Amino acid sequence: MPTQSTSKRLWRDVQVFDGLVQLSEAMTVLVEDGRIAGLWPAREFNEAHAQGAACAGRGGVLTPGLVDCHTHLVYAGNRAGEFEQRLEGVSYEEIARAGGGILSSVRATRAASEDELIAASLPRLDALLADGVTTLEIKSGYGLTVADELKMLRVARRLGQLRPVRVITTLLGAHALPPEYAGRADDYVSLVCDEMIPAAAAEGLADAVDVFCEGIGFSPAQCERIYQAAQAHGLAIKAHAEQLSNLGGSALAARYGALSADHIEYLDEAGVRAMAEAGTVAVLLPGAFHVLRETQLPPIELLRQYGVPMAVASDANPGTSPICMPTLMANLACTLFRLTPREALSGMTAQAARALGRLDLGRIAVGAPADLCLWDIQQPAELAYAVQAGRLRQRVFKGEVVYAR
């Protein structure tokens, strides 16, 4: 169906999950000029509230557009061979130390042009959109040179121009140590701080800076240098932390006011407390946990106890989470991590937006941008309960119905 365009439209008699909770009765929602202009219980709605509005949808479940707050969507090649290796008992760390893992994707991505990366990435982006995504973060991290990291960020920005979706970009220069810097990690960190971050900031290509704080990545001291450089250039901070061990990376990120700490399977109470005090979001990545067949669960009860917001993301990447289906992540977050369906759905909407520093997104509230999904289901929990394609009836971006069936 072709894209529809009108400045004023209604969704009537819909069950609403507003990004935090399911509203208690059927609602009518008015969108005008790209924003949510009204929200009424259906039984109280009066036509005078919305004169001239076209009815865009009736019935079903209306949620905020999904926000995928952690992806590595831009890359070339694949790592299916490593998937087989892991099934044969070779660990992720062993593969990485042997020159595979992230560095395998680095070789392929360095060799690809921007246009080739666009062609490789568009099908993955389209899969996310078909599952209800209206905003996503895309990280670099498979270039590991100034030129190649900027190339990846430019591709990410172009993807947001080629499709009706909001793309937030994150510079992940400290994803792995490139082979040409073997044994010289501090020198590479200097490159990230002195050249990569300034170049990305000068071109307006990055909204945030991320690091991989891990034994096979970068030390807390090295990550701290990168945080200081990011702050000096006005960029937000994020962290891959406590995925394989506890180096205190989440607490370090929190001290620098990080938007989020991601993975966090080995996070301890001190780290949880630091995140709570800083308002840092815990981004759960059940896809990587599932694919790597991990057993160390993130400390969900501690996160609840301290009131740390929990987001859920796909971590779409070629090695450890080659999955472009956020609703599957909701199911995995519930079945593997014991989130409630409400927590999982909030984690893919309001809390995911918080992890990107976009408190205006991921909500159905008067004044919020009208990024919406209308689903052919009876209650919001079904998005986490059942793993199933084809439930999306409409995807609305900035008030425009950009997909309908």
Curated annotation (Swiss-Prot):
Residues that, per the record, bind Fe(3+): H70, H72, H240, D315
GO biological process: L-histidine catabolic process to glutamate and formamide; L-histidine catabolic process to glutamate and formate
Residues that bind 4-imidazolone-5-propanoate: R79, Y142, H175, Q243, T320
Gene Ontology CC: cytoplasm
Entry binding sites for Zn(2+): H70, H72, H240, D315
Main location, first listed in the record: cytoplasm
GO function terms (MF aspect): imidazolonepropionase activity; iron ion binding; zinc ion binding
Function, as annotated: Catalyzes the hydrolytic cleavage of the carbon-nitrogen bond in imidazolone-5-propanoate to yield N-formimidoyl-L-glutamate. It is the third step in the universal histidine degradation pathway.
Family: Belongs to the metallo-dependent hydrolases superfamily. HutI family.
Protein name: Imidazolonepropionase
The species this protein was found in: Ectopseudomonas mendocina (strain ymp)
Gene that produces this protein: hutI
